[in-house]
């Protein structure tokens, strides 16, 4: 799906990411990254399970962060999706400066695609030779599917990964 036969699972994700970072537009953090503590704070989520995948080593051409976040009810998950959509739309067309772990990056957001139960947005890193990410978020029952698919030729990979996870959640009913 990502165009790489050598991607392997890496770090399992079991909690929200509380990495200290600064964004020039703080409300774009959820449109930029998956499973962020600042984004999920106060949402009522009850659990998180995720995984990071890439080629081996630190010099990879493909990177995916995928997470499922559970809520006590479908209504709470849907409310989180609606809030996320509103924030993501406010990031569209804007460039955000991110300072993370002592490094500064600039990302430009494209327009948000889709509407609940699934949304996505493409963001492109400036000065990174075409490195871009598709953020995708979907809701299925009481679960938020939170995806970030990055590489040099990203089209709809985040969306397709989200669809596969939604199908699994829907089959568990």
Enumerate the predicted regions with their spans:
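N-terminal "mature-domain start" segment
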Residues: 1-50
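Short Gly/Thr-rich strand-loop-strand
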Residues: 12-23, 86-132, 172
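Sequence contexts marking disulfide-bonded cysteines in secreted/extracellular proteins
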Residues: 27-31, 90-92, 132-134, 149-151
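Short, surface-exposed beta-strand/loop micro-motifs that present aromatic residues
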Residues: 48-56, 132-140
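A short acidic-to-branched-hydrophobic micro-motif
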Residues: 49-82
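Short, surface-exposed coil-to-beta transition loops
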Residues: 62-65, 129-135
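Short, well-ordered beta-strand elements
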Residues: 64-67, 138-151
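Surface-exposed amphipathic alpha-helical segments
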Residues: 148-173
């Amino acid at each position: 799906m990502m165009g790489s036969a050598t991607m392997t699972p890496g770090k399992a994700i079991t909690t929200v990411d509380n990495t200290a970072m600064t964004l020039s537009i703080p409300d774009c953090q959820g449109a930029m990254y998956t499973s962020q503590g600042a984004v999920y704070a106060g949402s009522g989520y009850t659990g998180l399970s995720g995984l990071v995948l890439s080629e081996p080593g630190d010099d990879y051409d493909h990177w995916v962060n995928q997470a499922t976040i559970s809520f006590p009810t479908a209504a709470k998950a849907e409310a989180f999706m609606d809030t996320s959509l509103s924030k993501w739309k406010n990031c569209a067309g804007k460039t955000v400066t991110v300072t993370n772990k002592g490094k500064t990056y600039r990302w430009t957001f494209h327009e948000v695609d889709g509407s609940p139960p699934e949304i996505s947005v493409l963001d492109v890193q400036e000065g990174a030779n075409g490195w871009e990410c598709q953020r995708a978020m979907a809701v299925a029952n009481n679960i938020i599917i939170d995806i970030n698919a990055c590489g040099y030729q990203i089209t709809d990979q985040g969306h397709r990964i989200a669809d596969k996870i939604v199908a699994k959640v829907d089959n568990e009913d």
